[in-house]
Amino acid sequence: MEEKQIDYTAIKDIPASAWEKLSQKKIYFGHQSVGFNIIDGVNDIIKENPAIKLNIVETSSPSDFNKGVFAHSRVGENVDPESKTDAFIKIINKLEHHIDIAFFKFCYVDINSQTDVNKVFNHYKETMAKLKNKYPKTKFVHFTIPLGTTKITLKTRIKMLIGKKDIWELDANIRKNEYNELL
């Protein structure tokens, strides 16, 4: 059976029945430092919208997945994206069939100008394919890598104006965007 896609333009447009259905899901979110900011943002949205009743818990313990939960925990180490992918698969294998939705995010510091983007992406892609095959009832969600801010100095502006292609100040974001395009 094909899932029906519904698009809402604002949180207030989402009916209470949809929030109730979501609250019954077993969700896992793997992250590092910035993920806590995302969880803070979700909690802020919940405070402003009483119909949202997500049970947000910092855990990756299978015993916490016997009812609806939005669980989250740290995965891997910052600046080592493959460690995050490897930690995520270990957690999902530990949780087995206890989850409905699972995802993790890389941090903006995980990709820099020296990163082999194809290697990182291929490791991620292979890992996610294994998980999808092993846990076909779990919906895996994919996230792009956030871009960082770059201080545009006079020197950087001049490089841009003269059409210089290799501007190291922008290289990290270029690599992140390359990854995002692969995704």
What are these regions (language model features)?
Residues T150-L183:
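Substrate-gating cap/lid alpha-helix
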Residues M1-I52:
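N-terminal module-boundary/linker segments of secreted carbohydrate-active enzymes
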Residues V34-T115:
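Conserved SGNH/GDSL esterase-like catalytic core that processes O-acyl groups on lipids
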Residues L95-D100, Y135-I162:
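A structural motif
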Residues S23-K26, P50-N55, H97-A102, N133-V141:
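Loop/turn elements at helix/coil->beta-strand transitions in domains of secreted/extracellular proteins
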Residues A10-I14, E82-N93, K125-T127, P146:
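Alpha-helical scaffolding within the catalytic cores
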Residues Y124-A129, N180-L183:
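Generic structural signal for well-ordered alpha-helices
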Residues Q32-F36, E82, Q114-N122, L170-N177:
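Soluble non-cytosolic domains of exported or imported proteins
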